[in-house]
Amino acid sequence: MDASAGSSAPHSHGNPGKQGGGGGGGGGRGKAPAAEIRGEAARDDVFFADDTFPLLPDFPCLSSPSSSTFSSSSSSNSSSAFTTAAGGGCGGEPSEPASAADGFGELADIDQLLDLASLSVPWEAEQPLFPDDVGMMIEDAMSGQPHQADDCTGDGDTKAVMEAAGGGDDAGDACMEGSDAPDDLPAFFMEWLTSNREYISADDLRSIRLRRSTIEAAAARLGGGRQGTMQLLKLILTWVQNHHLQKKRPRTAIDDGAASSDPQLPSPGANPGYEFPSGGQEMGSAAATSWMPYQAFTPPAAYGGDAMYPGAAGPFPFQQSCSKSSVVVSSQPFSPPTAAAAGDMHASGGGNMAWPQQFAPFPVSSTSSYTMPSVVPPPFTAGFPGQYSGGHAMCSPRLAGVEPSSTKEARKKRMARQRRLSCLQQQRSQQLNLSQIHISGHPQEPSPRAAHSAPVTPSSAGCRSWGIWPPAAQIIQNPLSNKPNPPPATSKQPKPSPEKPKPKPQAAATAGAESLQRSTASEKRQAKTDKNLRFLLQKVLKQSDVGSLGRIVLPKEAEVHLPELKTRDGVSIPMEDIGTSQVWNMRYRFWPNNKSRMYLLENTGDFVRSNELQEGDFIVIYSDIKSGKYLIRGVKVRRAAQEQGNSSGAVGKHKHGSPEKPGVSSNTKAAGAEDGTGGDDSAEAAAAAAAGKADGGGCKGKSPHGVRRSRQEAAAAASMSQMAVSI
């Protein structure tokens, strides 16, 4: 710290002719009369601290935030070591220890010192400024009777002041009545440094620079003599207490804590501007305008912002004041808050803040000791399976307004998300399916659709499975037996009427060889493709779907599973018919529908006619996992029930259980077991029988149309549940 005078142009608020050197390192320095100060500077002898203050190699050098505790711009007469005025120096201390590099203002001249001297609050209060009366100690040191205090809570500046006071006694002319400096004054500073070794080091003391002319001029402006010297000393020590140590310790603790806990996170600020708890006197001063409060942190409302003692129970263990006109002096300076008070602060919601080390109840809780919770939203939301949450909570308010409101953009993003989820579900389904196969030893397991897609309600074990694929048990047993398995429903196989089931075994016997070859080929193809097929969607056909328009309206989930459409014209998709292995060239497109889309599958007329699909039937679309091609299959669920409903004797047959119906079922099952041609017919008969049993008790009082409609609904419901279970 440099208090040199005469090194720059005069800078003062008031009487420039009488100002003393009270300026700090960053800005202008206070000046005594130029001629007097230059003359004094020319004949001053500067003594290094090494002459009176021994080196302390055993003390750890706690590096301060800047290269030196106070930035100094001294003249050539100044020394970077800790110096003491050789002669005629008042016991004043660099009252200008403000530096621009430390972020504080400076006491620009002696006029500001005089402003500090004219405080309304008396110096001698009930509680002294420091634990020991520094003024009495210095006065005793001047008179040759030093009193060693236990803790003089000043800084390196405090030591410089006090040693400068000793030097002034040695000189013994300008400011006070001369008396020799005591020999044990260096020992007193050694003991003081020992008691404060955690906060100050010998290097910090050696970085302080002091000029005798500045001390003399300042003391002279304060009245001269011992009284002026003591007043100057008190002002300097007060300034050091309220600014320098409060700045140095929090910053040092923050830097150390940030380096130890998380070096990637920056320090919360180079100028925190904390004020420690007030318990002593409050002095209005213009010197307090030199520092800026920490702007990055605003105390929450729960804190209250009240100044409290470190040990007091309260939500805010330190005071953060934005006052420009007060300097808070604590009766117990620089004492960190207790762990209980710091715990209250962290429990009140400040745990995410990076606090100085002394505020944390444990060493590990300084700066970012709490990990940030993951903000990634869950991939699914409750209520609708497969619906992806957009994660808008992560968007800032500014980005929320830019969120695409266009239906097209929103649809594209939604489709992309659902496609990604569909791929993930597919992979998980494959892994689970393979693991189940290895565990059970069976080559065939239910498809991913039944395990991971839309929830299904399993039907009773006694119901015959009429679904798209035969039950897994039949597929497993087919390679081990000579009996052919019933193949998938083919489009060209004639469907029996209710009156034809009796001659069915004879027809099956005549065409046994051909059916055997066809069913064997179907088995191999089915066993191969069933492992690779993934269910995409199904659609119950309406009258418009099977009419002359030649298009089928697809459900909404088509936009997820089928190729993405960018234009209304759509894309051409080759669809392989699972039953006939014929490839149909269909066109997948959409119609704009009230800010939404209606998806269509065109060029389906030939497919519907070849499979003899009518209203109430449904189609199922698959994708081949390996090849990526699409497969389609038509399933008929209404023929037997509808034709039986049209006949007048259908109600009686179902109600009384005529032998003809069981005969139909048994014959159909037998035919399916022998030549594999009656699989679908037997399934239809079983569905019709189930439908008849379900509503047989209530068919007597209904019209034929009502009976037919109820049976169709029952058959459709049973077929969809059976299909889901079998798949």
UniProtKB/Swiss-Prot annotation:
Cited Pfam families: B3 (PF02362)
Output compositional bias ranges, type Low complexity. 1-16, 64-85, 421-436, 505-514, 684-693, 713-727
Q: Where is this region: Disordered?
A: 1-38, 64-102, 248-282, 395-463, 476-527, 643-727
Q: Where is the composition biased (Basic residues)?
A: 410-420
Residues in the DNA-binding region are 537-638
- Tell me one GO molecular function of this protein: DNA-binding transcription factor activity
Query: Domain of life of the organism in this record?
Result: Eukaryota
Q: A GO CC term? A: nucleus
**Keywords per UniProt:** Abscisic acid signaling pathway, Activator, Developmental protein, DNA-binding, Nucleus, Transcription, Transcription regulation
Main localization, broad class: nucleus
Gly residues compositional bias: what residue ranges? 17-30
Q: Which GO terms describe its biological process?
A: abscisic acid-activated signaling pathway; response to abscisic acid
Protein location: Nucleus
Q: What does this protein do?
A: Probable transcription factor that may participate in abscisic acid-regulated gene expression during seed development. May be required for seed maturation and dormancy induction.
Cite the record's note on assembly: Interacts with RAD23. Interacts (via N-terminus) with TRAB1. Interacts with ABI5.
Q: Which protein are we looking at?
A: B3 domain-containing protein VP1
The species this protein was found in: Oryza sativa subsp. japonica (Rice)
Q: What is the lineage of its organism?
A: Eukaryota, Viridiplantae, Streptophyta, Embryophyta, Tracheophyta
